[in-house]
Every structure is written in structure tokens, then in C-alpha cells.
Amino acid sequence: MGRTTVQGRDGVPLFGKRLSLRKLKAKLGREIGVSEWFPVTQERIDAFAAVTEDRQWIHVDPERAARGPLGGTVAHGFLLLSLVPYFNFTNEVFSGRFRMAVNYGLARVRFPHPVRAGSRVRN
């Protein structure tokens, strides 16, 4: 099989590494890279709350949240979702030279578990 790559109009690859279609197919259903850890700090949660105007107490009030059902403040689901570019650009498969990246869309996104302030996440 031939090699496949995504190129811009000028012929420059949009992604840093080329994978043959055979190698890419072999990775279906398997882990294709692990990102660097990302610290989910209260400061980051507060900044996200300010930008999005979502200042629910479960996100921004550590004292009240400590008494609540989750035992402390938790990150917004959309804060975690917004880290997808970070995860992509810091793993061994997608890291490298990108000319640009564009979000195409999402399907069936769910937030099954809360992420407490002070946690670390990665893909």
C-alpha cells in the first residue's frame, strides 16, 4: 500500500509525521500515543470560569465544594474538552511540525467522572 498524508494546497504536509495506510490501520482500536500530563489547578479552573461565565460553586468555591457531594471543586467538562489540542500536540504520534489544526466536530462526548482540582490528566 502507498503512503498517505494530508497536505495543504502548497504541498506541505499538515501533520509532522507520515504513516502508511497499513500502519495506520494496524493502530485501529489501539493506543496511538500518550500526551504529557496536564495539571488541573484551581487557578486554571477559576480562569476558565471567568472566560465562560460558568461560576458554579462546584467549580469556584473550594470551601462549599469540600462539603458537597464531590468533596472538592471539580473542573468544567468543557475545560477538559478544550485540552484536546494540548493532548494531541504533546504525544509521540501527533507531535511535530503542524501548519495548522482544525476542529471538525465531536460526536457522543460524555463526561462520566469528575476531575478534582489538583488532579493531573492526559490522553
Where does each model-flagged region fall?
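Hydrophobic beta-strand-centered segment that forms part of the acyl-chain substrate-binding groove
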Residues: 69-72, 82-123
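Catalytic strand-loop segment that frames the active site of acyl-thioester-processing enzymes
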Residues: 4-75, 89
